[in-house]
Amino acid sequence: MGLAVAHQLARRGASVLVLSRRRSEAAGFVAAGMLAPHAEGIGGALLRLGQASLQRIPAWVAEIEADSDLACGLRPCGIVVPFTNATERDGYATAAWGTALDRSGLEREIPGIGPRWRAGLLFEQDGQIDNRRRLMRALERACVQRGVQFEEGSEVLELITSHGETSAAPAPVSAARSAAPARAAHPARLEAVRLRRADGSELELPCRTAVLAGGAWSARLLPQLPVVPVKGQMLSLQGPIGALPRVVFGPGTYLVPREDGLLVVGATSEPEAGFSEGLTPCGQRQLEQGIAALLPAASHWPPMERWWGFRPCTPDEGPLLGPGPIGGLWLATGHHRNGVLLAALSADLVARGISGEPSPGDGEQLEAFRWDRF
């Protein structure tokens, strides 16, 4: 998310510095890259945000590819959601956007699909992008080509404001809030950030405008943000090229086929794990059982990688976008399962807001995902 925002700001002529504690922590290097607002079965404002971002993605990818001279691996391959019966299929939250499939339709779209699945929905408008191997690398190069500077290994410790406060002190929480909570008459403004560099030295960096895109770690810097980590484990297999033509989004497991036959399999959802690192036998077994149920033949494909990461989750699983609790601080975090999907529009919304060039409808979208909406 941080790279996407940095790139859009740089394209608008801003001078951008990215402070990154550890590049490998970014969820963009962990996610499967599904572009699935319909297959996920989400609703309301989050669905509308996802649909709008999905429409923006082809042009967004074209901008990244033009600036980086690298392919991003975008594939509008469609996604199939299987069900055990037609009643479940017809009651799915986003069924109106899909094509109903019976068993023969499932077998046509997903050759070799497991026998328990009797119905399905095909969302041809959904797809995937190869984020781990292509998109993130292209975004980094696009940022560099646009003049973005990077400080890898630099951890932001505090946000220092004009009131002499720091982000280490949580904001007071009222017992109740109205639908449109009042803002402070004279909110503190961002003046600087205190950071620790890779060599252990600490300094204050003057800064009047910043974007917090800290993912699952965002609340460590701003405790009033309702963002918690949800651990996810994944694995990949090497299958034959073309063996699986579409993404399969099953209950608890999804299969994402890359063009070269690599099959990305995800993902566990472990809110109880906190920031506990590492793979677990239980988590890997869950993925293997999901593979066997969805595409039995894939259980015999050679294993390639196993990894884990942390999703930034909010109480309603929607992102925190727009102005934050400190003047000059913007938020682009809390995207949970949909960070790759929502990156295109989230980056636009934040970059346009900071640049003072909002488009019609931006205010409504940002209002729906205010940090203090809960």
Please give the residue ranges for each predicted region.
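C-terminal catalytic lobe of FAD-dependent flavoproteins
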Residues: 132, 301-374
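Glycine-rich FAD pyrophosphate-binding loop
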Residues: 10-29
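N-terminal Rossmann-fold NAD(P) dinucleotide-binding loop
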Residues: 2-3
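Helical element adjacent to the flavin cofactor pocket in flavoenzyme catalytic cores
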Residues: 122-163, 187-201, 205-209
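Short beta-strand to alpha-helix junction loop
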Residues: 48-52, 86-87, 122-141, 278-283
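Active-site lid/adjacent beta-loop-alpha segment flanking the redox-cofactor pocket in flavoenzymes
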Residues: 29, 241-327
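Dinucleotide-binding Rossmann-like beta1-alpha1 core, especially the glycine-rich loop
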Residues: 34-112, 118, 290
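Central helical "cap/lid" subdomain
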Residues: 197-249, 277-281, 297, 361
